Design a protein with these regions (language model features):
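N-terminal secretory signal peptides that target proteins for export/translocation
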Residues: 1-6
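Bacterial N-terminal signal peptides
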Residues: 9-21
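Sec/Tat signal peptide C-region and signal peptidase I cleavage site
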Residues: 22-28
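A short, structured loop/turn motif at beta-sheet edges
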Residues: 28-30, 55-62, 84-91, 139-148, ...
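Tryptophan-anchored aromatic micro-motifs
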Residues: 29-50, 62-68, 92, 143-154
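Predominantly extracellular/secreted and cell-surface proteins with exposed
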Residues: 60-129
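Acidic, glycine-rich flexible loop segments
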Residues: 113-146, 152
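Edge beta-strand at a domain terminus
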Residues: 134-136, 144-192
């Protein structure tokens, strides 16, 4: 009569235990459907700004449409132009629509055109006129829940005229500067 080896029995039990674990759907967040755009302030207030609709295409690109919620913004007439703005404590942050034609598509590895649709400027409530050199660019990075962007400093005068290369997003990393946490009222944008 053969005796069972305890190690083999222990190994069999471990294998059975692993097989009994339920299968979990581990799909990552997808660039598909309607997602919410939310700003988080330095005092952890979350402000729903609107939504973005993602529509995958068959070629690996994803078409997008950004829709900001007008009721969340106040109108400011700056430098002969109307801006949609958020009034914060000590800082006004205004959306700056990208002013030139662009493809309206992204890929999972290149979110630049979406980032260019989420440009903002900031200024003091007492400032007169748009301070276009006070631009904010939110470089988006994937998270488990969606996309998150921290502000980077840009000069919005850079896009006052159309680019010589219209198919390439103008704000490349060399046109952007990091901003220390806590300096700007809007600390991050999320798309979830």
């Amino acid at each position: 009569m053969r005796r069972r080896r305890p190690l083999l029995t222990l190994g069999s039990l471990m294998l059975m235990g692993l097989l009994a674990v339920p299968v979990v759907d581990a799909r990552a967040w997808e660039l598909q459907g309607v997602k919410s755009i939310t700003a988080t302030t330095r005092d952890n207030q979350r402000i729903a700004l609107g939504s973005v609709r993602f529509e995958p295409r068959g070629d690996g690109r994803v078409a997008f449409t950004v829709s900001l919620e007008p009721a969340r913004f106040t109108d400011h007439f700056l430098s002969m132009k109307e801006f949609k703005c958020l009034d914060g404590p000590g800082e006004v942050v205004c959306h700056v629509p990208y002013p030139h034609a662009q493809p309206g598509t992204i890929t999972p590895d290149d979110l630049a055109w979406l980032e260019h649709n989420l440009l903002f400027l900031y200024q003091l409530p007492t400032d007169f006129g748009a301070k276009l050199w006070n631009g904010l660019y939110f470089q988006l990075e994937p998270t488990e829940q969606g996309l998150r962007g921290r502000p980077q400093a840009i000069d919005l005068n850079y896009i006052s005229a159309p680019s010589d290369t219209p198919g390439q997003p103008p704000y490349q990393p060399e046109q952007r500067d990091e901003i220390a946490p806590g300096v700007r009222w809007i600390e991050s944008l999320t798309i979830e």
